[in-house]
Amino acid sequence: MKKILAVIGLLFLMVACSSTEEVKSSGSREKIYRTSTNQTTVRNIGKFQVDSSTYISRGKEERIKFIILHYTALDNVGSIRELTGGVSAHFLVLDEDDNKIYSLVPLEQRAWHAGVSAFRGRTNINDTSVGIEIVNDGIAKEYRSDPNPYHPYDHYVDYKPIQIEKVAQIIKYVAEKYNIPARNIVAHSDIAPSRKKDPGAKFPWKELYDKYNI
């Protein structure tokens, strides 16, 4: 009988060790949440092991909150040159009928696309956004010398359907990955209205909604 009880006790301990535990820190009323020891993942820093799963902090959030759309106001060559220099974006969609989307900056890193910006109580939107640059002239060249800063719809350049399809797929991928709501998928002109117009009056926001459910 003693052997049976000992076995039952051992099984109980094994089950307890395989589940999430709530540990009270000594001398404090705070609670520490600890995950299973048998699910621990370990890597090394120098000669020391780093345990990244036994104790998990709940005080965290995703960096990426917004998706910002831009036009480059340059041709393909100029856009590539500009966006591989000091200015950058996470994705570049060229003015070409092909199946390529260019990733210029990894999503986990910050790109320099927003500039001085603010939106929904946040500033410096580079810190919390993914930037998508689309090769498009923006304002047609014959109207760029117009001193009036406000251009009518006809002054803007159309986007190619393939570009919009690519942009839609990027948005859907990033929004799903980081749980970004539609209200946070915005124009450069939304976060810097006093100095930016892109992606311009001819960017088909309604098409994104109607055709791609964005």
Q: Where are the language model's segments positioned?
A:
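Generic surface-pattern signal
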Residues: A6, G85, D210-N213
